């Protein structure tokens, strides 16, 4: 009986050691997202947006720049899936890819045209905090002749890289 117990203990030890070795040998996910990383990413995005606004470029050039910024910092596939709603689950990969590309262009044109409103204004990051499984980065937009308004960016690394997946403007998604 003593032999069976000690053999079982050795087996458990060996199994535990093997599992532990495998766990450490597997590629580990990059360290968890932090408030500083989320805030820093939005600071960079806002800096690039402010540079485009202040560039004096033609609207078409600004729209092209905005699309590059959007693709660089936004989780465009996640946002497109959300915009498509339940139909996204039924769409093929090719359909989702085509929709995502069209959605990316649409958002870039629609909101890129609004850059004119920001000329002479700015967006400033003021705070960041953890929420559920993501971070909220809070900023304030200041436009000429208008009261400052609140912008909240939801940031996550679930897609494999640091991206924003939602913007709330004055409480509206």
Predicted feature locations:
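N-terminal secretory signal peptides and thylakoid transit peptides that target proteins
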Residues: 2-20
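Alpha-helix boundary/capping and short turn/kink residues
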Residues: 19, 93, 108, 172-173
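Sec/Tat signal peptide C-region and signal peptidase I cleavage site
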Residues: 26-32
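Early exported N-terminus immediately downstream of N-terminal targeting peptides
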Residues: 35-114
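Solvent-exposed loop/turn segments at secondary-structure junctions
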Residues: 105-106, 143, 169-173
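Surface-exposed, charged secondary-structure patches
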Residues: 109-149
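Short beta-strand edge/turn micro-motifs at domain boundaries
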Residues: 148-173
